[in-house]
Amino acid sequence: MNEDGSVCNKILIAFQDNDQIANLKESVLGEVFRLDKANTNHDENIIKGLTWSTKYYEVRYDLYVDTFDDFEEWCKDLISSEYDDLREVLSGIIVIDSYTMEKDKIDQNKLLGQLGSVLQDKFFVFMNTNKDISQDVIDELNDDNSMQLTSDSGNSVEIINYHNVSNLKLNQYNEKIGFERVREIIDTCEWSGGHRVQTVEAKADSTDVDLESVFNRLKEARLKYLEIEDEDEREQFALEISNEFAEFLQ
C-alpha cells in the first residue's frame, strides 16, 4: 500500500528465459520504465516504490518481474483461479518473447486471446523479439487481433516489435512503435490502484487536450475504418474523423 493507505498500482512484465534475457531486461526496463542498471542487473522479482510520470499525472507503482521457460504453461498458470488475486491488482501485463508464424508451433494467438479474456480493463502488450517479423506484419497482426481476439471485456493484446530493424519512428498508420508505443499505452492505461496525482504542469494549463480521450477515439476510428470495404465510404469516413479532431483540438 501507499503511505496514505491506498492500493499501490502494479505492472507484471515477463521475459522468456534464454541466453539473451540479461540484455532484454536491461533494455526493456531501461527504455520503458527508465530504470538504471542498478535496478535491471539483479534478480529481484519485485521492484517497489517506482513513479510513473506524465505531463498530466503521476502514480506510484510496483513492477513485478517474472521469467518463463514455456509460454503456454505460464499462460495457463496466470489464467487459473489460483492467480485471481494477482490479476485483480494488476494494471497491465507485458510479455517479452518471440512471436512465431509457424503453423506447427503452439497457437500463440489462442493463448493471447485466453489471457486477454481474463484481463478486464488491463493493458496487455506482447513484445516480439523475432527480427524476421516486419512492422507491416505486426500492423496486420494487430488489426486481426483487434477484431478476432477482443474478449467480452473489450480487451485485446497489442503486439509490438522489440527490434526496430528499419529505424522507423511511426508505422503505416502514423502511430508510435517500439518502446515509445509501450510507454504511450501505459500513459493512458487504467491504473488498478487509482491514486493519480495531477502534476503541477497539468494544473497550470487546464486547457490542454485530454490525451486519453484522443487515443481512445483514434483507436475506435481506426477499427471502424478497417471494417469499411467501399473506397468512397472510407474516404468519407476519414474526412469526417479529420474534421472531428480538428474541432476537438481547437
UniProtKB/Swiss-Prot annotation:
Disulfide bond entries: none
Gene Ontology MF term list: protein-macromolecule adaptor activity
GO biological processes: vesicle-mediated transport
Keywords (A to Z) from UniProt: Chromosomal rearrangement
Keyword Nucleus included in the entry's annotation: no
Signal sequence interval, chain numbering: none
Superkingdom of origin: Eukaryota
Pfam families for the chain: Adaptin_binding
InterPro entries hit by this protein: Irc6
Keyword check for Protease: no
Protein role: Involved in gross chromosomal rearrangements (GCRs) and telomere healing.
Family: Belongs to the IRC6 family.
Protein name, entry field: Increased recombination centers protein 6
Gene: IRC6
